[in-house]
Amino acid sequence: MKTLLIHSDYLEFEAKEKTKIAEDADVLSGKMDECLTVFIAVEKDDESDPDAVVKNAVEEIVKTADNLKVKNVVVYPYAHLSSDLGSPATAKEILAEIEKELSGNYEVLRAPFGWYKAFKISCKGHPLSELSRKITTERKEEVKKEKVVSKFYIINGENLELTEVNDEVISKMEDKGLLALLKHELDIKEEGKENGEPPHVKYIKEKEICDYEPSSDAGHFRWYPKGKLIRDLLSDYVYNLVVERGGMPVETPVMYDLQNNAIREHADKFGERQYRFKQGNKDLMLRFAACFGQFMMKKDMYLLPKHMPLKLYELSTYSFRYEQRGELVGLKRLRAFTMPDMHTVCIDMKQAMEAFEDQLWMGLKTGDDFKTPYAIIFRFTEDFFEENKEWFFGMAKEYKQKYGKDAILEILPGRKHYWVGKVDMAVVDSFGRPIENPTVQIDVESAERFGIVVHDGDKKVHPIILHCSPTGSVERVLCGLLENAYLNTLENRPPALPTWLTPVQARVIPVGDKHSAFALDVATKLRASGIRADFDDREDSMGKKVRNAGTDWVNYVVVIGDSEMESGKLTVTVREESELKKAKKEELTVEELIEKITSDVKDAPKRPLPLPMKCSVQPIFR
């Protein structure tokens, strides 16, 4: 914000003509004697925290008025002070708030926004009669006042005992995943802990999954065919998961107009760094989740209690967060990502809590299906927890029975977010750092902010809304899978993806030319059965072909030689059942191999291999 403060004998104005952004004002002319005239230009930066800029502007005006010993203040919109103006909606809101804050102790006259005005002013002409000030959104003292100190507990679901976290509790924790998550929450950094490049970054390049796109912004990726296949399979998985549970898929825009008050307030509340830009006279932002579009859609729906709980689901391709360059780490933290995002409208808190519990188990199921066990943390405001602790203890008990694990509980003394309760689930990477993935949140603000109502007889009710990402971002899911694959190597097992996600599920390798026709026939039968199989016809040694299959993490490697052709029994190396230095081999017929792979994949999503069957003509992408 830019301001020009004039100690005036008088200020007189008259509004002459409206512009298209003019406010409907009651006062279109006025005069004030012996006053401080404050010319104000609201700037784009002010949109990041309107409350802070109002507070700082009022403090500066009060300080100047008191120094000059004046009790009359004129608030005068004056766009010519800046070339980087904020949106009209934000400017109107800020100017009105400044007037409101000053009115308790001063006589205030505010000129209307968005009008062509004639004015006369007489400046007193003493050394302090003309002052210019740059007002920022900085919150120095307020940050200290508003700092919320949470309490952390370990909940044992077996005896429902809450143990407040302290150094002794931390030193005795045996669950490495839960300990890593707790240390992350408490910002405990361990000396000597690795801070280099995590293994998954090497894997995504080496396996031709994806890589940074140098001609784009940092944190944006190019995806190769194998990586695109994995992402699509993960997307199919989440789609099936939510649709089976009543989710209705929708699609909404990736950018939004910050002149919409609800959009701007929700964006500011979120607090993450955002991609914001100006196009023409509009201030726009790229979404960081699917909330905006889904909330606007719900606002326009005629909702009745019988529709509840109503679940809308979107795979937001893409969502954007402008993370600092130094914070970008492979697939764990990036600027453009694919977020499965479901929002559930609930008629009341009872229904919201039931849906929360259902979605907790849905999130935990994804860890089971991906073979990436989660550590979990519940977060509640103190009031909400005290009112609903028996419900929480019931979940903790069932979690202990199903998974044999404790959980972390964070209690916040007051509500500083739009939610009163949430649960976060995290995979732990090879450096012992959490990768937060699934989440469920109970939102008690957004329905009112966006004007979402349920028509319940003669009443209009603002519902409770759950935010749920059943898996977290697709990129983070893959990050967790690859980090978990690396951890396999520390347990003498080869790194691998689950068979349903592995791009090449089976590779058929002929020992010599005379075995090629038979081997090709086997590969063809596998593909005809819906198995992603290829055929290594390259002119490499047998040893190199087998090593290449290992490098490509092929789950089932089939070698065809004389004995296989004669007996019809294939020699198959099963990767997920092998040790690092000792391959697990089985002799199977083609039919038995098809049955084994089909049983391995079960009812997981299926897609064909998007590469030529013959390895010799498969392109090299990097």
From Swiss-Prot:
Zn(2+) binds at C291, H343, H467. GO terms for molecular function: ATP binding; threonine-tRNA ligase activity; tRNA binding; zinc ion binding. It is found in: Cytoplasm. Gene3D superfamilies: Anticodon-binding domain (3.40.50.800), Bira Bifunctional Protein, Domain 2 (3.30.930.10), D-tyrosyl-tRNA(Tyr) deacylase (3.50.80.10). Binds 1 zinc ion per subunit. It catalyses: tRNA(Thr) + L-threonine + ATP = L-threonyl-tRNA(Thr) + AMP + diphosphate + H(+). It is an enzyme of class 6 (ligase). The keyword Ligase applies. GO terms for cellular component: cytoplasm. Its EC number is 6.1.1.3. It comes from the Archaea. Residues 199-498 are annotated as: Catalytic. One of its GO terms (biological process) is threonyl-tRNA aminoacylation. InterPro entries: aa-tRNA-synt_IIb (IPR002314), aa-tRNA-synth_II (IPR006195), aa-tRNA-synth_II/BPL/LPL (IPR045864), Anticodon-bd (IPR004154), Anticodon-bd_dom_sf (IPR036621), DTD-like_sf (IPR023509), Thr-tRNA-ligase_IIa (IPR002320), Threonyl-tRNA_syn_edit_dom_arc (IPR015011). Keywords: Aminoacyl-tRNA synthetase, ATP-binding, Cytoplasm, Ligase, Metal-binding, Nucleotide-binding, Protein biosynthesis, RNA-binding, tRNA-binding, Zinc. Residues 1-141 are annotated as: Editing domain. The keyword Flavoprotein does not apply. Homodimer. The N-terminal domain is an archaea-specific tRNA-editing domain that hydrolyzes incorrectly charged L-seryl-tRNA(Thr). Catalysis of tRNA editing is performed by the charged tRNA itself. NCBIfam families: PRK03991.1 (NF003068), thrS (TIGR00418). PANTHER family: THREONINE--TRNA LIGASE, CHLOROPLASTIC_MITOCHONDRIAL 2, THREONINE-TRNA LIGASE. This is Threonine--tRNA ligase. It comes from Methanococcus maripaludis (strain C6 / ATCC BAA-1332). The lineage of its organism: Archaea, Methanobacteriati, Methanobacteriota, Methanomada group, Methanococci.
